[in-house]
Amino acid sequence: MDLTTLRAVLAELRPLLVPARFEKAQQPNPHTLQLGLRGLSGMRWLEISWLAAAPRLLAIDPPPKQGDGSTLARVLQHGLGGLALVAIEQEGFERVVDLHFAPRPGEASGRRLVVELMGRHSNVFLLDAQGRVVSLARQVREQQSRLRPIASGSSYGRPPALQSDPPSLEESQEHWRRRLQLVPVSLRQALQQTYQGISPALALQLVDGAPEPAAELLAQPVGTLSQEHWDHLWARWQRWLHDLEQERFGWEVDDSRSGSGGSSQYRCWGTASSGPVNAPLAAYYRQRLGQGELQRRRASLELKLLAAREREERLRQQQQDLLDQVESGDDLSRQADALLCLAAPSRDQVAEAQALYRRARRLRRSVVSITPRLELHQRQLDRLDASLAFLALHGPELSHGLHHDGDLEEALCQLQALEQESEELLARVGTEGRRSGRRAPPRSAPASTPSPLELLTPGGLRVQVGRNHRQNEWISLRQARRGDLWFHAQECPGSHVMLKASAAEAADADLQLAADLAAHFSRARHNGRVPVLKVPCDQLQRIAGAAAGTVTHKGGEVVWASPQRAAHWLAAAESVPKVPAEPGP
């Protein structure tokens, strides 16, 4: 959150929150604080975060109750209880906000909550009337900052003053240009080193609309800019300063140019019309932080599964090596036969032959115990490969293209389901096969009804796509009715696809689409053509003792499918509403 965005948020919050009585404090995570304030228009929540990647102060929708037992939340609950927010101050171009609390409006401030939004140096301080630190979000020790160490009980000192000068509407264009050209550096460096409040995002916005791409123009030395460039930049500079002075803010998003060297993805000044900033900004942070959390959790789960697969492959190879040694039993028997076929074998030769026979018998008997262990490790490898395939298939869906809160919540639910299944699988991998007498941990009861991907074919038939092992079993064995068709990529981990042909006769286009979806949601999705099995659901059978989502089939036929064709179709498809669960056949 840069200075311009902070000014826009505070201009919107002051009439809503001043005055407002403090009621609740909670800390949902280690870097975020949420305050409940009751004003004239009702209860409102303020979120303050000192996360280095996304420090922010803004109003949010009522959050769930969580984190009210943290130390910082308890101190704030005790220190601000019975007080009202009477002022919100922010001076100059500093990203420091003072929230003043007093027993009632018009009285002297008894407590101050100071919010510093400065990247990795962001922090939150609760101060008493004398300016001493009662509590703070994170301690700043001398090893971290010799200039400004702060701890509970010490006197609060403001951050060091900014070295550059504050922008001013009274400055002339000639003086402004001369200052920027004083040192032969790039335009970006000149703006940020000469004036306060110029963030990288604001620098991009100031040069937006020039003939050259914004990033290229900012990288040019100031001495090479033309008069046209300076006139355009001066006009944008004046518009920015006027909007700041008059608190004329709005919200605009330009997704087409984000991350491509153009302006930042959103702006809150220079917009076509004025409007609220806080609500869309809160949604923006919610989406970006949610996507980051999804990517981190997905990467962590992938590392766990890969480590478990490597360990399981090593154990399987050990059993395979033991099984390969069984073939040497025949050689041992022949060596023993050769010793006993001597004309006059000695006692030592007879003893050696008997030892060779015993070794050969032990090797042959070991097949009975090695083979089940080898099969067990192979089943575990297949399960791990399937889990990795699910994670890879739905990774792009979990990480990108989430433009609405519903999309983000759905992605979180799908990832959580994969995490729960993987935890059970990893626990089973760590216990099965070590001791025959040890039992695997019981499977946890599912918390809710599975929610597979549901789509409508061009012919109006429903098609269900399992996105984890539990969903695969649910659509293939529990929800399937006589007449439904099951699709799965041949000899390849992936999703079960069920075409609900029991409702109506499936056209050729519907059958081809279901096959394409099965190819797309498989590990062979990058191939040009994929063989897909098409089997009537009444020919599916659960494998006794196997894990969820493991089936065998009789008959069926192979259909050639195109994963790319399914990908193009999915881009325009819409999910159908959920329907009540139907009893299995």
Q: What residues fall within each predicted segment?
A:
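Extended, highly charged segments
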Residues: 1-585
